A protein has these predicted regions:
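Active-site helix of classical SDR
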Residues: 70, 106
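Residue(s) in the substrate-gating loop at a strand-loop-helix junction
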Residues: 90
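Active-site loop immediately N-terminal to the catalytic Tyr-X3-Lys motif
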Residues: 48, 97-101
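SDR active-site lid
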Residues: 118-182
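Substrate-binding pocket helix/loop in short-chain dehydrogenase/reductase
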Residues: 46-59
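Conserved NAD(P)H cofactor-binding loop of Rossmann-fold oxidoreductase domains
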Residues: 38-43
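The beta1-alpha1 cofactor-binding region of Rossmann-like NAD(H)/NADP(H)-dependent oxidoreductases
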Residues: 9-20, 52
């Protein structure tokens, strides 16, 4: 494809991660044309029973860091009058789910934030899409490969490759949102 790839490893669940990543891209003169906010974590327990450091990590990973990445890289895209932002929400963003209240709430934020940001950037040639999938067969749920395979066959989970294709297709077709599988 004639594209040079430079991997940059960062823990996005800590304060300052977004600014550090942005500064690195600026120093290396790497213009970001497509921003995909897909880092995530999941745990099943009532919010008040969760460990404080895990709650904080989830808030950074799902709310603070994606917002800041959109802020920093979105400004560059707005100046260039071109760019794409894909934010990963979840089907859980539509309803409150006991046991995953914090997770669902952070995903609801990403959906709402993405829709508003889309309106703010549309006149500047920057497309923002929010992806709201159901369960995806990744290591997020700590399931065995056999269980993931069964869940895919039963239509309960989606293969990550299939989701990625659907998400990128929606992004490049300037869709506001996509609920794959529905």
């Amino acid at each position: 494809y004639g594209i040079e790839v430079l991997p940059l490893y960062r823990d996005l669940a800590i304060p300052g991660a977004a600014k550090e990543l942005y500064d690195t891209c600026q120093e290396k003169n790497i213009p970001i044309e497509v921003l995909v906010n897909n880092a995530g974590m999941f745990f099943f327990c009532e919010t008040l029973q969760a460990k404080a450091n895990i709650v904080e990590k989830m808030l950074y990973l799902h709310v603070t860091t994606p917002t800041q990445l959109c802020y920093y890289f979105g400004q560059e895209m707005k100046k260039r009058r071109h760019g794409y932002i894909l934010n990963m929400s979840s089907l859980s963003c539509w309803l409150p789910y006991p046991g995953i209240t914090l997770y669902a709430s952070t995903k609801r934020y990403l959906k709402s934030f993405s829709r508003g940001l889309r309106s703010e950037l549309l006149d500047y040639g920057v497309s923002v899409t929010v992806l709201c999938p159901g369960a995806v067969a990744t290591n997020l749920y700590n399931l065995s490969d056999n269980l993931k395979t069964l869940a895919i066959r039963l239509g309960i989970m989606m293969r990550p490759e299939k989701l990625a294709k659907k998400g990128i297709n929606a992004l490049f077709h300037h869709r506001a949102s996509l609920l794959p599988g529905l």
